[in-house]
């Protein structure tokens, strides 16, 4: 769940909606400070900003469920965001479409592999390996020897173009052969 004192930036709220819809869903509480204290909704027009976040900046748009609660004489909005069925949910940013995911209480930009995982899930591609190709076996052996790999290193190991490498990494993630990690210093890494 996430707390918002108020909704003043539709694009920023769209990032949170994207992250929740692309992950496991969640709740957005408007009128609550970051420390959890109740401030109450100050501007009823915030609902239009919320609608704009979903309908203008989020692709595809989400249907939002909003409930108003009275707490200590103040109104708090509870917005339920379900895990989406049409992933990736992307935000129309100034520099193009970006999908977000949620980790703990933060939103992060999803990389191409994670977006490909969502695409393969949506297209109902097989979640079980039939057999590994030579290139996949080469990558798996590399991971046994060296622990983790980036997308660019995986492309070199398998001697493939980036786009094909992304497809393979996504498939191996979906098959639960490899896992991904992300940190702000090293970016996305893949390991057994």
Predicted features along the sequence, with ranges:
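Conserved N-terminal catalytic/coupling substructures associated with nucleotide/phosphate chemistry
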Residues: 1-192
């Amino acid at each position: 769940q996430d707390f918002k004192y108020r909704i003043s930036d539709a694009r920023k709220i769209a990032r949170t909606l994207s992250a929740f819809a692309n992950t496991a869903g969640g709740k957005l509480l408007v009128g609550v400070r970051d420390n959890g204290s109740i401030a109450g909704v100050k501007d009823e027009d915030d609902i239009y900003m919320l609608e704009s976040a979903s309908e203008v900046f989020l692709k595809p748009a989400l249907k939002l469920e909003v409930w108003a609660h009275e707490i200590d004489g103040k109104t708090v909005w509870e917005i339920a965001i379900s895990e989406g069925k049409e992933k990736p949910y992307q935000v129309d940013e100034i520099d193009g479409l970006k999908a977000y995911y949620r980790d703990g209480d933060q939103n992060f930009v999803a990389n191409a592999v994670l977006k490909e995982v969502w695409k393969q899930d949506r297209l109902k591609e097989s979640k079980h390996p039939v057999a590994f190709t030579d290139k996949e076996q080469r990558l798996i052996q590399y991971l046994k020897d060296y622990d983790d790999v980036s997308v660019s290193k995986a492309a070199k190991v398998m001697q493939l173009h980036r786009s094909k490498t992304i497809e393979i990494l996504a498939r191996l993630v979906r098959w639960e052969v490899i896992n991904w990690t992300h940190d702000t210093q090293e970016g996305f890494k893949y390991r057994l």
